[in-house]
Every structure is written in C-alpha cells, then in structure tokens.
C-alpha cells in the first residue's frame, strides 16, 4: 500500500479510496459465511482463525493464558453489540446481519482507515474516503440485508445503484481481497530475518513469543511455508523491531 501511494504521489496530491464500501454494503466473505454469521464473536475472527490456524499464533502459551485473550475478545464483542437496537418487526436473521454490519463499521474499518492514513501521509498524499460520508452510512445502514444482497452477491445495492455509470466489466467483477505478496522470495527473506533473530537468544522478543514456533517456521522448507506461517513470522519480526526502536518496559505479572 505504501508503494502504491508512493507511485500515485508522483502524479497527484489527492486520491480516492474505497474504505467502508464493503462495511456499509456487505462486501466481505464473512457476510456470506454461515459459520461467521452464527458465531457470537467478531465474524472476521472466525474466518481468520479458519484460514490461518495455529501457525499464526506465536505468543508464548503461558502468556496467552495469563492475558486471557478469549475473555478479552468476548467482552469486547458484548460491548460492541450492546448498543445495536433491534428494529420493530425485524427478523432474527436481519437483526444479526445488521449487527455484523455495525461491527465492521465500528471495529473493523477503523483499522483500515488508520493504515490508509499512515501510509498516505508518509508520502504526502491526501486520500479521501467518499464511502465514509456519514450521510451515506446513515442512509444505507438500516437497509435490510435482503435488499443489500438481493441478487445473492456482494455489494448488490451499490452495484445496481451505479449500473448506468460504470462499465459492465466492473459491474460483473467479483470482489478481489486485498492482495498479499506471492513471490516466494519474500517468505525466504522472512525466514532469513527470523533466523538472525533466533541467533540472538537474549532478545526481549522471546519473553513474548514462542521460540520453538518461530524456529519451526523459520526452518520450514520453502514450498511448505503457508500464509499462516508467514503471518507468524511477520508478527514476530514486527514485534522485535518495535522493541528495538522504542525499548519499552514490558512488565509481565
């Protein structure tokens, strides 16, 4: 994203971005995932947990147990949905789908907006987000899910509302998730950096992450490096860099 913004900045000082369109109009896969719909938790965690599995979890087991992250997530979920008022005559299904929309608008998208703001401002690019206009969000928010997905597809309402303004190829295009790096050299580079980190056994990151899990991911044969393993290595290296840069006092009690 940073490199994309950097390239845009060579030609323009302002750009438009689509953050919040998926949240408002229902574009993410978890909106259509029955398991994620039924779960009494943040729906994206269901999908991420299924897609990434345990390989993405690199924190030490004793630390995760002490932090009691499951209770933290459960408390956060209850707080998030507590303020969603049920509409008169609203079915159980429609109420659940509106809660899912609410969760994405109040919890999920703000992470994306923060990422967008930081990456764009780093190169001096102003990125505007028209789908975050409060008038649009307020107008569409209470639209029933049966209308938002009237043809069984993602963002049905948005596509139909703009059908006479966009090419048919765009109208028919299936949502493509944000791309991840596919070059195997990237995974190998992550492994090399992780091996360098493992060679520093006294590094404070190992007070937080499971050294054995990092070791297994760092020494796995290249064709066997899953996206989950990559994610675990990325988290470890990011955490190590943060500790190196800011040297915080981390008190584990």
Give names to the regions the model predicted.
Residues 10, 14-16, 47-253:
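Adenosyl-5′-phosphate
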Residues 1-3, 9, 30-40, 91-94, ...:
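ATP-dependent adenylate-handling ligase core
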Residues 3, 23-24, 157:
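Phosphate- and divalent-cation-binding pockets in alpha/beta enzyme and binding domains
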Residues 24-50:
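A mobile, often basic/glycine-rich helix-loop segment
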Residues 12-28:
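Short acidic/histidine-rich active-site segments
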């Amino acid at each position: 994203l940073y490199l994309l913004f950097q390239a845009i900045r060579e030609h323009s000082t302002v750009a438009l971005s689509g953050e919040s369109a998926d949240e408002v109009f229902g574009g993410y896969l978890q909106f259509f995932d029955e398991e994620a719909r039924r779960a009494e938790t943040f729906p994206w965690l269901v999908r991420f947990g299924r897609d990434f599995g345990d390989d993405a979890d690199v924190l030490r087991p004793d630390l995760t147990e002490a932090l009691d992250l499951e209770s933290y997530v459960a408390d956060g979920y209850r707080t998030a949905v507590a303020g969603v008022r049920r509409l008169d005559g609203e079915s159980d299904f429609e109420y659940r789908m509106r809660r899912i929309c609410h969760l994405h608008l109040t919890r999920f998208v703000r992470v994306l907006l923060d990422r967008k703001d930081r990456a764009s401002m780093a190169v001096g690019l102003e990125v505007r987000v028209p789908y975050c206009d409060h008038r649009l969000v307020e107008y569409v928010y209470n639209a029933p899910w049966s209308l938002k997905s009237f043809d069984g597809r993602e963002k049905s309402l948005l596509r139909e509302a703009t059908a006479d303004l966009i090419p048919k190829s765009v109208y028919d295009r299936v949502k493509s998730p944000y791309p991840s790096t596919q070059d195997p050299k990237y995974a190998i580079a992550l492994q090399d950096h992780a091996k360098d980190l493992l060679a520093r056994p006294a590094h404070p990151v190992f007070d937080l992450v499971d050294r054995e899990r990092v070791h297994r991911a760092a020494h796995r044969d290249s064709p066997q490096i899953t996206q989950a393993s990559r994610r675990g290595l990325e988290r470890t290296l990011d955490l190590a860099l943060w500790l190196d840069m800011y040297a915080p006092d981390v008190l584990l009690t």
